[in-house]
Each structure stands twice: as C-alpha cells, then as structure tokens.
Amino acid sequence: VDEKTTDVTLENGDTQKTKWYQFRVPVRSGTPINGISDFNSIRFIRMFLTNFKMPVVLRFVEFDLVRGDWRRYTKTLDESINQIDLNDDELKDFEVGVVSIEQNEGSYIQPPGIERERLQGSTTVQLQNEQSVTLKVNELPANKARAIYKNISIDLRRFKKLKMFMHLQKNERALAINDDDFSAIIRLGTDLNDNYYQIELPLKVSSNGTSPIDIWPEANNLDAFLETFGAIKLERDQLDFSITDLYTSTAQDPEIMYTLSVKGNPTLAQLNTIVLGMKNNTSAPISGEVWFNELRSAGFDNKGGWAAIVNADANFADVAN
C-alpha cells in the first residue's frame, strides 16, 4: 500500500537508508482451508513471507485489525445494462482503502484550509488522524465505472452547497494518465438504484508537488448548488421524461464544470445513501486512483420565516358584518 524510506544512524556513526512497507490484507478475500466457513471463531493469526532469494531480517512494528464505513458497490453504474451485478472478474479490478496523515506521511497532505481535529483531554490536547477514502481501479474497461457506498441519514434542505476535495493520480499499474481520463461520480439518494441525484465531474491529474494545492487542485473541488437539485426534477417533469430513467440536465449553466442528473424521486430531506465512484472516459482500459475527502454541506440558510394569526371584524355597509 505504501513505502517509506528513512535515514538511520548506526552505532558506528554511518547512515543507512531503511525502507518500511505498509500492507493491507483484505480479510474476506482469503482462501478457506480445512473447511472453515466464517469468522465467528478466530483463535489464532499467523503471518509468513516467502520467496526471498537470501536471508532477510524483518522488523515488525504493529498489527491492527481495521474496518471502514465505505463498502464496495458490487453493481454496475451503467443504466443501459440489465444485468446490474458485477461478475467475479469485474470485482477484482477495483478496491477501497484509506490514506492518512499519520500512516502515509510524505505522500499524503491534508486539503487546503482543513485542520486536524483536536481531542481535548484533562491535561493534554491530542491531534486526531486526518484521512481520505481511496478508490483504486486496475485496467478499468473503457466507459466503465466502479464505486463505493455508505449508508447515511441526513437532511440537506437548509443548506446551499455541497462540497468535496478530490485527488487523482496513477497507481502502480499505470504508465501514465491524462487530465479528464477519469470522472468522479457522486450519487446521493434515498436508495442506491432507483431514487438518486448524480453528479459527474471530470478530474485533473494532481501534480507531484508538496503543497496542499498541488495535491488537491482547485479544478477537482466539487462545489455544487443544492438548489439546482430540485430544479432538475421540475425540468424533467416538464419534458414528460420517464422517472425510471436517468435524466441529465440540458439547461444548466455552461460554466458549471459538473453534470447533474436525476433518477426517480429523491429528496434532499431524506438522503440515505452516498455513492462515490470513478469512470473511465477513454476508449481503452486504464488504471488510476482517486482520493475523496471532506464531503460536506455549506451555506446554512438561517433566514427566519413568518407566521401570523389574523382576527378581523368587518362591516360591509348594510349588507353584512
């Protein structure tokens, strides 16, 4: 997953470079041995490494069992495909992970303007780990997409904007990728398949710089106006477009870099799922990796409303009271 090189001073005063490797092993992708069927009773864990050509001394730092809230979305995002479940080969070409400021120091930098959360103790203040969820694809076929999802429960009716930082880079299997080779896909809805809003934003390749703006280029920042989400449903209904098909707006501002679509009847008052994905826009299989960070709502509408009770006594000449 990651590699870090450090300079170590030996006892004789010489300096030697040492490499540290971080591995993440997907537990549920293993091969059952001797009839084990589940993870309900795990008593021992053994780790071994093989295929070394010479004696090697390894220093083992820590072994952690970790989990995440994001899950791989095992269905296709292509609305034209009837068989929506991905097959075994398609499930092998993408994975979900995480990069953080503590475990990936040097290769990871927090987004501009974002500060690490502080845990206030009785005598000390501890900085929390700042991290991003990652989606990596390997030889993703042309015009195909892969995604991850998370279950939520939020109401965005009182907010004006939806924002997020994104980072695109080639992974270890990619020779090179270019700007707009990948698009980010963000879906928010009441369910994963039939009622959702979709945003698609072409991504620029992040540079190899060391500043936050290099790692998180402004062109990749999502800045969506939530008021247009309701407007696109009205636009679709006026055209008598089927609500069971994905409708893409044709009347949005041309200066807006993202494309907004809707399917079904989602509502910002009850969002239950978020889908984050990446789509191959080229005509050939390519590999890449996207980091998603700080998906957030902004611009809270705090304007008060009006309420009144009226009691009137009117006299209309000699006709009525």
Predicted regions and their residues:
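Extracellular/surface-associated beta-sandwich interaction domains
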Residues: 1-321
